[in-house]
Amino acid sequence: MKVVEIRESFGPDSLQLVERPEPVPGPAQVLLKMKAFSINYRELLVVNGVGRWKPPLGRVPVSDGVGIVVAAGTGVSRIKIGDRVSPIFYPKWLEGRVAAEKMVRALGGAAADGVLAEYTVFDEASVVRVPARLTDEEAATLPCAGVTAWNALSSFGDITPGDSVVVLGTGGVSIFALQFARMRGARVIITSSTGRMPSRS
C-alpha cells in the first residue's frame, strides 16, 4: 500500500510517497481504507520537526481523516465492516480529563503514525462512526480542531446563551469555536494581529 512518510530530514520537501505492507487487524482492531484527510497547523509542526511534535524519521504524518472499515479482528462488536469512521486524535484518551499519560500517542506525531496512508489499523475503541449527513471531507476536519473547540466550550467552558467567547484568529479551532459558541447562543469576539481577518469571518 502507499503511505506518505517524513524521510531523510524535516520540512515539506521531506515528505515521500513510499510502499509499506498492508496492515492486518489484530484482536479488537479494525482496518480502515482511508477516504479523506484534513491538515491542521499541527501538521506543519510535525513535518518541520518542531519541539515536542518532532517525530522520528519514517513517521506517517496527519492526525485527522475518515475511512471505511474493510476488515475486523476477532472480538470487534461495536464497529462493522462497511462503517464510515474517523480515528480519534488521542487513541489512548477514551474518557476523563486531560492527562499527560493519555496524550503521549497523538496520531501522526512523536509516538504514533498518522493516517496519511491507503490503509490504517486502529483499536475498535479508538474510532467513532461518522454521521451520514457529513461528507468525508467535512468529517475529516473534526478529530483535532472540531473536538478541541467543542471540548473547550462544552466541557471546560460550559457556554450558555448570553455568554461572551473570545477566539484568536481564524484558524480551524477558532472557526469551530465561533460556530459552536453561536449554536449555544453566545456572543463571539474575534481577535487578530491584523485588521483584515475579523472582517472576513
Residue ranges and their predicted role:
Residues 41-48:
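Cytochrome P450 core scaffold surrounding the K-helix E-X-X-R motif
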Residues 84-85, 132-201:
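Mid-domain Rossmann-like dinucleotide-binding core that forms the NAD(H)/NADP(H) cofactor-binding site
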